[in-house]
Amino acid sequence: MGFRINTNVAALNAKANSDLNSRALDQSLSRLSSGLRINSAADDASGMAIADSLRSQANTLGQAISNGNDALGILQTADKAMDEQLKILDTIKTKATQAAQDGQSLKTRTMLQADINRLMEELDNIANTTSFNGKQLLSGGFTNQEFQIGSSSNQTIKASIGATQSSKIGVTRFETGSQSFSSGTVGLTIKNYNGIEDFKFDSVVISTSVGTGLGALAEEINRNADKTGIRATFDVKSVGAYAIKAGNTSQDFAINGVVIGKVDYSDGDENGSLISAINAVKDTTGVQASKDENGKLVLTSADGRGIKITGSIGVGAGILHTENYGRLSLVKNDGRDINISGTGLSAIGMGATDMISQSSVSLRESKGQISAANADAMGFNAYNGGGAKQIIFASSIAGFMSQAGSGFSAGSGFSVGSGKNYSAILSASIQIVSSARSISSTYVVSTGSGFSAGSGNSQFAALRISTVSAHDETAGVTTLKGAMAVMDIAETAITNLDQIRADIGSVQNQITSTINNITVTQVNVKSAESQIRDVDFASESANYSKANILAQSGSYAMAQANSSQQNVLRLLQ
């Protein structure tokens, strides 16, 4: 090789290598000091793009986890509030159960109702004040609320919390048929009991025999209540139209085929002769006699079989119908209509021409006065449904005139046939009580008025035409049947809250599972980003040592390259 002075190639090569080593050393020091393999786009352009995408995904997943935890906090707040509401409903049902026995007086029942009213107020207070970050949770407005729980848009979970005010829960369906006066065989079917299928009950005979009647039908319905969601009660009761008046039964007087015979009884049955005679055979007839607070005779079927009177119980007893199979009441806890079909439905007062009282009652509605329509649907009344009116002295005026002791005597100017003109009652609803022609204008007869002296028939002023119809009932548990109804309504309310809580619980579990999943995903994404972005200290330390040594050796090489030019001077000596 020749000796040159102008261009020191060896020195230039040494410098170039030193520059490379210097950059490698700077990069290595930058990585070791930052802990990152990629400190700028120049370090790894494609790797940086992937790492940035992974970092964005990991950060978004972190916020999604926070969103999920916020959602859990909201749902847990609502859940705990409803847990307290359930305790209140349990107390309401307990107090209603306490009121549902005739050992309670009106005074004590009123006190229990006052307690229930306060409990309902607190239940509504919880519903109206439970909130999270200013959002009401239990008032019905928290519907289809979305929570972003993914790294991409529209990866959401929806949550809804139903309203829990007393006006929104406990809605219970009550349906009560008309009073039945005919026997038969009933084949009852519940239509679409589960939204799809029909449910057919076993046929039940409606008669006066043991093991038949509305009691047997109610037992069959209640036996399947867990499947259909429908429960039944019955009220087979014949109540006198007025306080017992002196009279007597016929020699062949019988109830449900059991002959009782002739019984003389006084006003109000003061000596108890009529009631005692009927109760003497109650184990055989299934019918028990008593007097109500107004002194009226009450015949009650204990097991739900019909009540059939043959012979004559006498006008003084005030019993309108010699054959009575009672009223059937149905209760459904979800507030929807009870759709029925079948055969022989007129025997249970639910035929095509029968007036069926229907109502859906919420928890709050049970707090105040129960309307006549609601009371009748709940089965408060033993009479015909729909509030129809009827003549109370007999099934018709003609029938009344035909009975002994009616006050109509020969020569009075009233014949049995003339009574047909009064055998229809005109009101908001019309009920025919016997075959009728028209209302005669000859005799002025009005509800509760009797005949006036001016009519020329003052000797018959004892005749009355009255009404028997549904009427308003006092609030809640202040009556026995009201207490029973509040028990049903409270049970429905408990079921409603349990359904809402169950839905909340399902969403909580869904969110928890999602949080667990995206937490694992976030860890894996961060791990993948770390593999790309973070420095491997072991490897980079080796690179640093290499670059450091090369930098030192490069400096030495440059020094040697520069000193090698001195050899040219020796040639010139």
From Swiss-Prot:
Compartments where found: Secreted; Bacterial flagellum
GO molecular function: structural molecule activity
CC annotations in GO: bacterial-type flagellum; extracellular region
Keywords: Bacterial flagellum, Secreted
Main location: secreted
Known role: Flagellin is the subunit protein which polymerizes to form the filaments of bacterial flagella.
Similarity-based family: Belongs to the bacterial flagellin family.
Cross-referenced NCBIfam families: PRK08411.1, PRK13589.1
Subunit structure, as described in the record: Heteromer of FlaA and FlaB. A flagellar filament composed exclusively of FlaA is indistinguishable in length from that of the wild-type and shows a slight reduction in motility. The flagellar filament composed exclusively of the FlaB is severely truncated in length and greatly reduced in motility. Thus, while both flagellins are not necessary for motility, both are required for a fully active flagellar filament.
Protein name: Flagellin A
Organism, scientific name: Campylobacter coli
Lineage, broadest ranks: Bacteria, Pseudomonadati, Campylobacterota, Epsilonproteobacteria, Campylobacterales
